[in-house]
């Protein structure tokens, strides 16, 4: 997973207008339109057959990525609704193998000057994509998924909705072995106690170990998140048929 760095809005917005010029598409203008959620620009360019809904656009951290992933990364809800309605590929991937729902589950709005963080737009993006049928599990081998990203970022609303929609609490783990960090491990390494609790209540197995690596508890202790130790140790102690709620709460 790569946490992507922002580039200036001015670079994105340059040359962007709701009434697009005719002729070949300007990639920077397209990226700028998505960044400011200008659905009119995007729709007009699609209807003019200058682009398709599955074309790429420049976005935060990429020279080019599928439009739906750029849209999800920006939390551009109007453009996202349009792309979904226009049958864009919901499971298209960035060069880092991230899908739109994964990016929507990871990021948030941050206003550092006001010390304000909001997940509202991104929570809605997760809902839109999940309700439209986006694949919640990563079909590529040894790759992260949306639930893991939500756990890593402490995105509780997104995490709970993904679980409600059927996301697997243990990811792709089998026989208590995983070849990529499980959602519980992702929460543990970041010290996200509430996310860890939600996952344990949903049946996440605290005894899963990364192949030749660590368990969720070991990740937590390695990163000095001792406030997770009690719940993860209790999770490890569950006997067959026991639930986290019945034994640990």
Which stretches of residues belong to each language-model region?
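Sec-dependent signal peptide recognition
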Residues: 1-7
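C-terminal motif of bacterial Sec signal peptides marking the signal peptidase cleavage site
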Residues: 14-15
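Terminal, low-structured helical/coil segments at or just beyond the last alpha-helical repeat
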Residues: 219-249
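Bacterial lipoprotein signal-peptidase II cleavage site
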Residues: 18-22
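Ankyrin repeat A-helix N-terminal signature
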Residues: 32-37, 70-76, 103-122, 149-155, ...
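Ankyrin-repeat boundary/"N-cap" motif
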Residues: 23-32, 55-68, 93-106, 139-145, ...
């Amino acid at each position: 997973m790569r946490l992507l760095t922002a580039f200036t809005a001015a670079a994105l917005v340059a040359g962007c207008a709701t009434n697009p010029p005719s002729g070949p598409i300007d990639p920077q203008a397209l990226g700028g339109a998505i960044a400011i959620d200008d659905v009119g620009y995007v729709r007009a360019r699609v209807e003019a057959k200058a682009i398709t809904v599955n074309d790429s656009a420049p976005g935060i951290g990429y020279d080019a990525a599928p439009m739906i992933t750029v849209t999800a990364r920006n939390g551009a809800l109007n453009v996202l609704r349009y792309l979904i309605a226009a049958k864009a590929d919901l499971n298209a991937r960035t060069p880092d193998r991230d899908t739109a729902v994964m990016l929507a589950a990871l990021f948030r709005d941050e206003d550092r000057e006001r010390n304000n963080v909001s997940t509202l737009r991104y929570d809605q993006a997760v809902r839109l994509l999940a309700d439209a049928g986006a694949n919640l599990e990563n079909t590529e081998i040894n790759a992260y998924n949306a639930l893991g990203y939500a756990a890593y970022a402490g995105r509780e609303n997104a995490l709970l909705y993904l679980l409600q929609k059927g996301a697997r609490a243990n990811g792709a783990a089998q026989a208590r072995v995983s070849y990529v960090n499980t959602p519980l491990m992702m929460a543990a390494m970041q010290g996200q106690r509430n996310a860890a609790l939600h996952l344990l209540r949903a049946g996440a197995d605290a005894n899963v170990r990364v192949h030749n690596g660590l368990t969720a508890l070991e990740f937590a202790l390695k990163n000095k998140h001792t406030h997770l130790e009690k719940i993860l140790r209790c999770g490890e102690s569950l006997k067959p048929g026991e639930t986290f709620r019945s034994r640990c709460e």
